[in-house]
């Protein structure tokens, strides 16, 4: 996924409206009785998009949701392991899931055949529902007359101290992915310098609201979350894909070991990987599909993936060293909100 070296700054453009014609519905597994309990760290737009497809394509498949941060929900699943309450967890990066893999059921969904092998766990413990790019969400009205940054290095300018917000990496896989990537790209000294400018929020959703409402000049987040503000017409909001490279990470869904809903849980899992669900996610929540049979440009105006320089990170290493990294991060004493 290497691309050319270029900095992208997305301003408001015309966002395509309406759903494109969907392909004929796949033969989803037949549902039995029992409500599927979905633990999800995703935003309302993403969850509603998937539930809308479920209602249309599988009206007898009932799904209830419990929301929270990815780390919080995974620890809840761990605490419930003796008597599972969740059927599916959606979603987190592999660098976070690796520490909890004993809680997941191996399941080779028929729908996963449309995904590249790299987006499926080799033992089918998790499957990518979509792919994220890391961006800086910028509110130009809060830059104090300074030009918008173009690089990661620009973000360590002391003038931006206290003006950049990020979620807590202990509770947010988004924040962990971002900070791990910065550490690998800029080194420990670069990460420490960036940390001096950051304010940490306990909730990932606060990052978006704080920038959107002008409380902070910048927020470090995933492309899909920030682009919703561009698509919504906030002309002061733009997205930065840093020139040195940004990070790409798949977002995964898992089947919880001992899922109470049984066959229904697998039916919901299959539906979440369907072409219909991924198109709905793309058009309503701006999440790049994991399937290889969807042309992003036909649905939303996001930069082509091969036009963005992507800095590769080792997800297995990130998972193995997660606790060690978080201890080092906490030693920086970053400001909190």
Show where each model-derived region lies:
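N-terminal secretory signal peptides and thylakoid transit peptides that target proteins
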Residues: 4-22
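Short, polar/charged alpha-helical segment
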Residues: 37-62, 229
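Extracytoplasmic ligand-binding site segments that recognize negatively charged/polar headgroups
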Residues: 41-48, 68-71, 85-216
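A ligand-binding cleft/hinge motif common to bilobed small-molecule-binding domains
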Residues: 95-99, 217-236
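Short beta-strand->loop
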Residues: 104-113, 126-127, 153, 230-231, ...
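Periplasmic-binding protein-like
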Residues: 118, 132, 192-194, 200-201, ...
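A bilobed periplasmic-binding-protein/Venus flytrap-type ligand-binding module shared by bacterial periplasmic
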Residues: 137-142, 180, 249-262, 280-281
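Mature extracytoplasmic/periplasmic domains
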Residues: 256-313
């Amino acid at each position: 996924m290497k691309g050319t070296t270029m900095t992208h700054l997305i301003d408001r453009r015309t966002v395509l409206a309406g759903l494109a014609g969907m392909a004929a519905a796949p033969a989803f597994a037949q549902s039995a009785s029992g409500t599927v309990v979905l633990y999800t760290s995703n935003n309302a737009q993403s969850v509603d998009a998937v539930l809308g497809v479920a209602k249309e394509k599988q009206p007898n498949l009932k799904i209830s949701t419990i929301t929270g941060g990815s780390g919080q929900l995974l620890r809840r699943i761990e605490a419930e392991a003796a008597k599972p309450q969740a059927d599916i967890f959606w979603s987190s990066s592999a660098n976070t899931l690796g520490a909890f893999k004993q809680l997941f059921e191996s399941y080779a969904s028929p729908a996963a055949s449309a995904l590249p092998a790299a987006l499926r766990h080799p033992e089918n413990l998790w499957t990518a529902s979509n792919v994220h790019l890391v961006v800086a969400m910028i509110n130009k009205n809060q830059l104090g007359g300074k030009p918008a940054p173009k690089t990661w290095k620009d973000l360590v300018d002391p003038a931006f101290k206290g003006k950049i917000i990020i979620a807590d990496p202990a509770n947010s896989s988004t924040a962990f992915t971002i900070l791990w990537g910065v550490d690998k790209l800029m080194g420990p000294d670069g990460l420490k310098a960036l940390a001096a400018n950051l304010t940490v929020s306990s909730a990932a959703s606060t990052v978006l609201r704080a920038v959107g409402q002008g409380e902070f000049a910048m927020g470090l987040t995933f492309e899909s979350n920030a682009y919703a503000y561009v698509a919504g017409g906030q002309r002061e909001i733009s997205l930065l894909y840093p020139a040195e490279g940004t990070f790409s990470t798949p977002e995964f869904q898992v089947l919880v070991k001992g899922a109470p809903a049984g066959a229904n849980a697998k039916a919901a899992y299959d539906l979440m990987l369907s072409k219909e669900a991924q198109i709905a996610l793309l058009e309503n929540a701006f999440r790049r599909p994991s399937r290889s049979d969807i042309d992003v440009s036909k649905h939303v105006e996001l930069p082509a993936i091969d036009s963005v320089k992507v800095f590769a990170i080792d997800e297995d290493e990130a998972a193995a060293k997660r606790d060690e990294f978080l201890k080092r991060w906490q030693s920086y004493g970053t400001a909190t909100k």
